[in-house]
Curated annotation (Swiss-Prot):
Protein name in the entry: Protein cholesin
Positions with biased composition (Basic and acidic residues): 61-83
Induction: Expression is induced by feeding and cholesterol absorption.
Modified residues (Phosphoserine): S23, S59, S97, S175
GO cellular component, one term: extracellular space
Annotated function: Hormone secreted from the intestine in response to cholesterol, where it acts to inhibit cholesterol synthesis in the liver and VLDL secretion,leading to a reduction in circulating cholesterol levels. Acts through binding to its receptor, GPR146.
Lineage, uppermost ranks: Eukaryota, Metazoa, Chordata, Craniata, Vertebrata
UniProt organism field: Homo sapiens (Human)
InterPro entries: WKF
Coarse class of the protein's main subcellular location: secreted
Keywords from the UniProt entry: Phosphoprotein, Secreted
Expression by tissue: Secreted from the instestine, secretion is induced by feeding and cholesterol absorption.
Compartment(s) of residence: Secreted
Region called Disordered, residue ranges: 1-83
């Protein structure tokens, strides 16, 4: 059987018109829910103005959409006021790259810091990039080899399998490997883990 297309009832068009009308008339949120947050309920709940009730025709989803739009408008107005006052919004500090975080993780492991703890994402990054001398410099590679000695389980098995596959690939290329440093790193990892 062929599926029949569902006709959009006129009721939704009426709801959309009412939603536009409600947003044009003004916010449903009273001055109690101003950005200062003095009169707002706990956890930022919206407080309706006493004179205006939400229209019963608006579904909960439509109300959420309307509230999101109003919140966005309030934030925009707040930024505009700050800009006019000459204050610049503070930008969050730049996030550190994955390389920096992973190498910092490795250094903390080597120094046996109390705040060091296993982090799978950092270990995964190190295992993926350990053959690249640009991403894991030579001064950190010896530390990485010491870290790999303690590698356990599936991570150890996969690292050995990948190293063997890379070695086979280098052997097939011939006697002149394009990256001798990479080949040396692969050999060191294989000798350590095999």
């Amino acid at each position: 059987m062929a599926k029949q297309k569902r006709k959009v009832p006129e009721v939704t068009e009426k709801k959309n018109k009412k939603l536009k009308k409600a947003s044009a008339e003004g916010p449903l949120l009273g001055p109690e829910a101003a950005p200062s947050g003095e009169g707002a309920g706990s956890k930022g709940e919206a407080v309706l103005r006493p004179g205006l009730d939400a229209e019963p025709e608006l579904s909960p989803e439509e109300q959420r959409v309307l509230e999101r739009k109003l919140k966005k408008e309030r934030k925009k107005e707040e930024r505009q006021r700050l800009r006019e006052a000459g204050l610049v919004a503070q930008h969050p500090p730049a996030r550190r790259s994955g390389a920096e975080l992973a190498l910092d993780y490795l250094c903390r492991w080597a120094q046996k810091h109390k705040n060091w703890r296993f982090q799978k994402t950092r270990q995964t990054w190190l295992l993926l990039h350990m053959y690249d001398s640009d991403k894991v410099p030579d001064e950190h590679f010896s530390t990485l080899l010491a870290y790999l000695e303690g590698l356990q389980g599936r991570a150890r098995e996969l690292t050995v399998q990948k190293a063997e596959a890379l070695m086979r690939e280098l052997d097939e290329e011939g006697s002149d490997p394009p990256l001798p440093g990479r080949a040396q790193r692969i050999r060191q990892v294989l000798q350590l883990l095999s």
